[in-house]
Amino acid sequence: MKEILNTILKNLIQARFTFVLLFYCLSVFVAIQFLKNTELFSNETLTYFGAPVAFDIYNFQYWGIISNSFVHYEYGNFILNAIGLLLLGSYVERRIGIKNFFLFGLIASTISSAFQLAFSDDAGIGLSGVNYALFGYIFTKTFIDIRFRIVTKNIALVVMLLFIPFCEYMNRFGGWNVATISLISGFTVGGLVAFLYSQYSKIIKLSLFLLLLFSGISLVYTPWSAQWNCANGIYWHEKSDTERAKSYYLNAIYFDETSLCGNDNLKIIKIDELSAKAFTAHNRGDYLKARYFYEEILKIDIENSWAKNNLKRLP
């Protein structure tokens, strides 16, 4: 036990970049806690801190898959990730140096967040994916590098791996929102990087390249994603190409029946189409048709004042 504590102390004393990251995460967390119960707080506020929502990431705010790692909202999430960063980050930084540690974190954050976004419609927030990458790296290195050998590696592996299905269970039945895909992809990346300079170097480099390639492509093309379809639907909607926009909104609803973006914007398109028909029929004196179209609009939007007022004007 004394040896373990001495090792932790040495890691912390020699760590530099780890403490910079921790201080930045703490600053963001404190600012969010200060603002979250005020009228100033919104999704836009989180974007300013570095965590744009999925829709915004697909709208060219690609930096969000990296900067979101520094953002924490809940106390439990922040405390766990802060402890993980201190212990795992300082351990790795001491052994590979600041430059390699920075590059490792950049790759881990990019891939873990991109995979989480691509397969869940939410990039998530926090350092969980990066911490799992650090653990995956350390655990794999224990078998090939004497500097990384730790006595409790098997116990730690069991705990870390069992935590993933536990979080998934709590996501479904306990109201949690843990980015489990980020944990899995982070652990995988860490394990791959550990073998980067081994006899499997070429295979590892190819694997990492493919993971990064998928991460990049997924930001501009994920047709199975409801949020991606919504982002494209709004893009074409704003360009007045309603047919193309409608196809994207329908796809969004296909992949997520509860998609507010898809359902609400389809209603807007339908109301616009009915409004144009009602306007034409009213001006031509075809009042029966006009009444029908006004009533159809009110079935979709019962508070539509334009349809209500024009109904009153009908003879």
Language-model regions: role of each:
Residues 232, 258-259, 304:
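Residue-level recognition of tetratricopeptide repeat
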